[in-house]
């Protein structure tokens, strides 16, 4: 009787081509039974093994899961059925950090992913102390001095609002999504006491994919992990690098691939 085992690795922040290249190399190295699923930027890498005994199947799966995890690096956020939203929430709860959004649009994108999860209200204010409160919302504006110093710079403007949201909401992290404007691709941004990080995204992404990009910024920042390719870092009020759409920010078609 043949025994089987399955391991699932969850990955976010790499392109489909990058993930596929890693899996093809693993296949060339002797790993069989690989399958790749993708939805809203989240990849599920399935490693399945069959062997004469359960112990042998377990050993084979564990060996390749560990090797693939090392190759994926900080893009690996969980194993099994854990979503990126759950991984980001777990990081916030573990570090006892509070997240806020600068505006209703951003709050809706993040809130739609976090609301179904247990204890999410302990890590995200859902606007109660920020954009959903009329008094607080009036305080979260682009600082006039920033507008005068960086006229037309929507990245600086978003960072300025995020800084104010941090203060108003007494939070640890503030996130913002900005749709495309003249001369600037849409982007996601996170601000904390150390500064700001931002990453351009494709205008073709779904709401869930945008929310995932926001929450991946949160996960990586909370856990002290490396940022994805194309992410810029800067101090609000100071010059920042150009923000361009990286390959990881391009839309990825939902698909299933077997290797």
Task: Label each region the model flagged.
Residues 56-249, 254-259:
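Short alpha-helical segments enriched in small residues
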């Amino acid at each position: 009787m043949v025994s089987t085992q399955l391991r699932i690795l969850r990955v976010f922040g790499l392109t489909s081509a990058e993930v596929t290249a890693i899996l093809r190399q693993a296949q060339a190295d002797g790993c069989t039974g690989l399958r790749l699923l993708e939805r809203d930027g989240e990849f599920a890498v399935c490693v399945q093994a069959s062997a004469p005994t359960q112990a042998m199947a377990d050993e084979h799966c564990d060996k390749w899961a560990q090797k693939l995890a090392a190759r994926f690096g900080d893009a690996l956020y969980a194993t099994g059925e854990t979503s990126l939203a759950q991984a980001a929430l777990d990081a916030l709860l573990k570090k006892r950090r509070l997240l806020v959004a600068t505006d209703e649009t951003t709050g809706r994108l993040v809130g739609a992913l976090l609301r179904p999860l247990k204890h999410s209200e302990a890590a995200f204010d859902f606007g109660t102390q920020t954009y959903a409160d009329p008094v607080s919302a009036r305080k979260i504006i682009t600082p006039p001095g920033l507008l005068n110093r960086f006229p037309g710079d929507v990245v600086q403007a978003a960072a300025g609002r995020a800084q104010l949201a941090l203060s108003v909401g007494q939070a640890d992290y503030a996130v913002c999504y900005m749709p495309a404007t003249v001369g600037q691709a849409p982007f996601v941004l996170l601000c904390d006491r150390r500064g700001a990080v931002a990453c351009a995204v494709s205008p073709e992404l779904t709401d869930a994919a945008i929310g995932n990009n926001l929450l991946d910024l949160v996960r990586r920042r909370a856990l002290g992990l490396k940022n994805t390719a194309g992410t810029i870092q800067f101090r609000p009020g100071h010059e920042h690098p150009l923000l361009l759409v990286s390959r990881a920010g391009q839309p990825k078609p939902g698909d299933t691939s077997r290797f």
